[in-house]
């Protein structure tokens, strides 16, 4: 089962068609960060074959129980149009996934939001900052992070939207395109998709 925002169902179905290939790439590119002692063959052995999957729509505002925790879904379009963050009020944690990490991708064509929509999502999260003490990022971040990373993204996108800053063409180990580095964050975006 996959619980996801309805706006990401089609994207999930398209990605699932090449899921084994994507998981193999992920194992090779990210696996060494989490398990540096493993060989590439050992990492690839962890990649599972595609099987049947049921997609369950999950809207913003949904509240559910997960392992004794009450979780609220917050719809935050950005990396994908159906991106969500998960608020664990009791433990004062906000799970941001791909919405807030050290390298944000908004350059995925029509499956990503504009910079303006992303900025609005981050402002909605920050308006609730009294409800969480830390954020839990996606991918390689295994520890809790300083929640003010959200304000870095707000400031960076404000600068891009006002024309006071511009990204540069570039590439890092995993991504490429137009990127803008600001304080602790890096935004990959499409200049023609600011607003």
Model-derived segments and their meaning:
Residues 38, 43-127:
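Catalytic core of the metallo-beta-lactamase
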Residues 2, 93-95, 136:
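Residue-level marker for buried hydrophobic side chains located in beta-strands
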Residues 19-28, 40-54, 116-118, 133-143, ...:
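Noncatalytic linker/hinge segments flanking ATPase motor cores
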Residues 9-12, 80-83, 101-104, 138-145:
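Active-site environment of divalent metal-dependent phosphoester hydrolases
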Residues 16, 106-110, 147-149:
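Short, solvent-exposed loop/turn segments at secondary-structure boundaries
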Residues 1-65, 102, 153-170:
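Active-site HxH/HxHxD metal-binding segment of metal-dependent hydrolases
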Residues 123-195:
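Accessory terminal helices/loops
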